[in-house]
Amino acid sequence: MDINNAKISLIHDWFIRESLGGAEEVTFLLDKLISENYSEPDLFALTENISEEQFEIFSERKINTSLIQILPFGKEKVQRYLPLIPFAIEQLDLREYDLIISSSHIAAKGVLTSPDQLHISYIHTPMRYAWDQMNTYIERSSLKNSVLEIPLRYLLYKLRSWDFISGHRPDYLIANSQFTSKRIKKYWRLDSKVIHPPVNIKRFSYNSEREDFYLSVNRLVPNKRVDLIIKAFNTLKLPLVIVGDGPEKNKLKKIANSNIIFYGKGTNYNVEKLLSKCRAFVYAGIEDFGIAPVEAMASGAPVIGLGKGGLLDTVNCYTQPKKNKISTGILFKK
C-alpha cells in the first residue's frame, strides 16, 4: 500500500457532547496526525451530536453516522440502542477506503472490511459490560431484580460473543495500556501492541506551592466511582473539589457534605490552575489508561488512586526509597 496516496477512514464509536472523554481526545489527535502527515481521513461514528465549537476540531468536516442517528434520542442516548449497535456498525460502507483506522471502546473495531483493506484498531478496552464488569453494570442499572434482568443478561451474553468475534476483524490491534492488553489477551485470545495515549503535558506547569484542598477530575458516571471518593472525604472532613459533569452529578451532590464543592457547566474554573494548586489528585476508577492522572502528575500533584488498571502503567508508587527514583503517588489496594 502506498500510504501517501491511500484513501483513509477514521471510525470512533460515537461523539456525544456530554460525554467526551479520553477516548475522544485520542480520536481527535489521531485525526490531526493523519491529516498533517497524509490526507484528511473521512470520519465515521455510530452517532454524533457534538457542538459547533467541538466540531471545529474536525475542521467542520462531515461525520458519517449509522442508522441509530435518525432513531428517537439516538444522537444523545445511543446506549439505549445497545442491541442494535453490532448491526449498526456493520452497515457502515467502507468499500472505497484503503486504510481503516478505528478508535474503539465498544463497536468501532467491528466494521466490515475486505481482504485488500488494512484495518488498524486502537483499543481503549474490550466491551466492559460484556465481560468482567457485567455484574457491576447490572447492579447499577434500574433493571436489577426486575423481570427485565434476565433479558438484559441474555443481551450481554450475546454481545460478549459479538465482541469476541469482532475483536478478530482488525489486522492489527493496539492497546492503550498493559491492563488493556492483558484483557485483550484474556477475552479475545489475541496479542496487541501497547502504545500509551498521547497527553499534552505542555498545557501544565509545575508549582511547588500547594493549597489545602484535594482535587478529582472525572466524567460523573458510575464507573468512575466518584461516590467512593465523596464517602471517604465526608468521613475525613477534608476539602475536596470535584470537576466534571455527567448523569450522576445531582445524585453525587446529594450525598456530599459541605467540605466538598463541584465545578462544571455554569461555573468559572480553570483545570490547569486547580491541578497546579491542589495538595493531591484523587482517583477511584479502574481506568483502562487514565489521562487525568498523567495531567495531574505533569502539574506536580501526587496521585492517590486505586492500584489497578492503567494507573499501574503511569504512577510510580514506591513503599521503600529507591535511588534515582521518586514516587508520584500512592496506590491503595481496594
Predicted segment positions?
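Active-site donor-binding segments of glycosyltransferases and PAPS-dependent sulfotransferases
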Residues: 36-109
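Short hydrophobic beta-strand element within catalytic cores of glycosyltransferases
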Residues: 302-306, 312-315
